[in-house]
Design a protein with these regions (language model features):
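Hydrophobic membrane-insertion alpha-helices, especially the h-region
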Residues: 1-18
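Short linear motifs at secondary-structure transitions and domain/linker junctions
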Residues: 15, 30-32, 93-98
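Short amphipathic alpha-helical segments, especially helix-boundary/capping motifs
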Residues: 15-22, 38-41
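Aliphatic-rich helix starts adjacent to a transmembrane/signal segment
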Residues: 19-34
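N-terminal alpha-helical signal peptides/signal-anchor transmembrane segments
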Residues: 31-52
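Low-complexity, acidic interaction segments enriched in glycine
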Residues: 47-145
Length: 145
């Protein structure tokens, strides 16, 4: 009887130590995945700017970016290698602008009153962002480095 109690308490102790650690590791992996997806959106915005000469407008800008990725002849043929998702996810252009954490779309704002134009790409579920609406030196720069 005492042996069973010792084994049960040992198991509970083991779980109380490993479960929080596993949760922290899972959260770190999710943060890495979200940041990678944001970097892919940044890469798509840079390609969009280099091919069209401008960034997409604020209103429906990310939707326009996805449509451009799907329809631009050069980008569409190479999209799965240019914008490779982290495993186990596989590339889907419609999921490019979606946070893997909650499924919410990233937010995008363009400031076209500055030269060069600057944008802000934000994750709705964290403080992570790429770019800045006021400082041109932060163009394409993530805030987590």
């Amino acid at each position: 009887m005492l042996f069973v109690i010792v084994v049960a308490l040992s198991y509970l102790l083991y779980r109380s130590l490993t479960d929080p650690y596993k949760a922290v590791i899972a959260e770190q992996e999710m943060t890495e995945n979200v940041r990678h997806r944001m970097e892919l959106v940044r890469d798509a915005l840079v390609l969009y700017n280099s091919r069209t000469g401008d960034y997409p407008p604020t209103e429906n800008g990310l939707t326009a970016l996805v449509e451009w990725v799907k329809t631009d002849s050069l980008i569409a043929t190479q999209a799965d290698s240019l914008f490779a998702f982290l495993p186990p996810d596989t590339f889907n252009a419609d999921q490019l602008i979606v946070s893997p954490r909650t499924g919410a779309s990233f937010t995008y704002t363009l400031n076209d009153t500055l030269r060069p134009n600057v944008y802000l790409l934000e994750d709705p579920d964290s403080e992570d962002q790429i770019g800045d609406l006021r400082r041109t030196t932060m163009l394409n720069a993530p805030n987590w480095n």
